Amino acid sequence: MLLHGIGMGGMEAYENRYVKNGILDFLLEERKAGRIRNLGFSYHGDIEVFDYLLSKHDEYQWDFVQIQLNYLDWKHAKEINPRNTDAEYLYGELQKRGIPAIIMEPLLGGRLSNVHDHIVARLKQREPGRSVASWAFRFAGSFPGVLTVLSGMTYMEHLQDNLRTYCPLQPLTEEENRFLFDTADLMMQYPTIPCNDCKYCMPCPYGID
């Protein structure tokens, strides 16, 4: 059972959606009764809510938390958008408490499979036989605390590429991680509009839809 969109609208939205109406207490009881096997939440937005819910882990015993994690957001999420939180912090906080992570946006809304030509050349020079996207999927899947990595697949080629990447998964080495972090630093030199096409900001009050 996933509590979706935690953090959007801040603490007030979380309390109105899940606490004041008794929904969270109900779900905790349902899990205790065995009718819900796993209970967790997906985090979007306000870090205060994320930190609060993790501080309640002893009480709620979260079975998983879904976070946005990729090699660009690892250290640059806040740089891209001040409302974001770096994935390094999010994953680290889950690890401290032994909470498994489900990874969303491993390709950052497709941006990590559609990168600048200089970045494509850099990745291809290193591993000519690998797709650009596979680097991001290997990064997301290499962390020991990751339960699963979500992938939005439009075409059969996407599925086949994912199967090549994960069956079996070759976790990144420390040197490969450094290579990707350097790649992320280079990507930040080519600024783009920080849009994941998630449409969470729509309808836009300024009409930019």
Residue ranges of predicted features:
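Structured C-terminal cap/extension of enzyme domains
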Residues: E59-Q61, Y89-D209
